[in-house]
Each structure stands twice: as structure tokens, then as C-alpha cells.
Amino acid sequence: MNREITFFRRFEADILASRKTITIRDSSESDFRPGEILRVCRNEDGVFFCNILVKSVTPITLDALTERHAEQENMSLDELKKVIKDIYPGLEQFYVIEFTRC
């Protein structure tokens, strides 16, 4: 059985349309492996909405995020940093999980 990853409801449409192709997580969600298929569910209610294939998992700091990361998240760099700070207040070390729908 595939492991699961959750996303806030506000990201569902972008994931389904392949506009969001990465997720940035803290160390507690950094153990996914390239080639692994994950069930994707909404964080708020646990409803399944697709599967994704993990392409890569790369460590990164908040300050090292670029416009390319923001583009892969389908938002501006300022928006991306704000979202990350809201979800993970006080953290600086993260992991970029690149994925594709499958």
C-alpha cells in the first residue's frame, strides 16, 4: 500500500492541473524516496484526490529558495516564503520534494 502525503485544500486544484510540482516540507516529512508513489489527500478532511510520483528530495534553507521554486509552487517568491513561515514558524531548514502526477 502506498504511503500518504497531505496538502491543504487550497493547493488541490494546482496539483490536479500540474501547476504545483514541488512541495516544501520540514524534516518530519523528508523521508520520501525518488520513485515512490504517494497517495495524496486533503489535510483538512483526509479525502484522497490523486497519486504522485516522487522525482527528488533535496535539502534547502528558506534563504536559498528561488523564483524557480516559487514557479514550481505556482506562486510568487514572496508568497512562497510567507506560506512556509506560516506553516513552519521559526524553521529555516526544509526539503524540496519534486513530484509529478501519476
UniProtKB/Swiss-Prot annotation:
Which portions of this protein are annotated as coiled-coil regions? none
GO molecular function annotations of the record: hydrolase activity, acting on carbon-nitrogen (but not peptide) bonds, in linear amidines; N4-acetylcytidine amidohydrolase activity
EC number(s)? 3.5.1.135
Query: Per its UniProt record, what InterPro entries does this chain match?
Result: AC4CH, ASCH_domain, PUA-like_sf
Q: Does the keyword DNA damage apply?
A: no
Q: Which reaction does it catalyse?
A: N(4)-acetylcytidine + H2O = cytidine + acetate + H(+); N(4)-acetyl-2'-deoxycytidine + H2O = 2'-deoxycytidine + acetate + H(+); N(4)-acetylcytosine + H2O = cytosine + acetate + H(+)
Keywords of this protein's UniProt record, alphabetized? Hydrolase
Concerning its family, UniProt says: Belongs to the N(4)-acetylcytidine amidohydrolase family.
Matching entries from PANTHER family are given as: UCP029143 FAMILY PROTEIN
The record describes the protein's role as: Catalyzes the hydrolysis of N(4)-acetylcytidine (ac4C).
Q: What is this protein called?
A: N(4)-acetylcytidine amidohydrolase
Organism expressing this protein natively = Yersinia enterocolitica serotype O:8 / biotype 1B (strain NCTC 13174 / 8081)
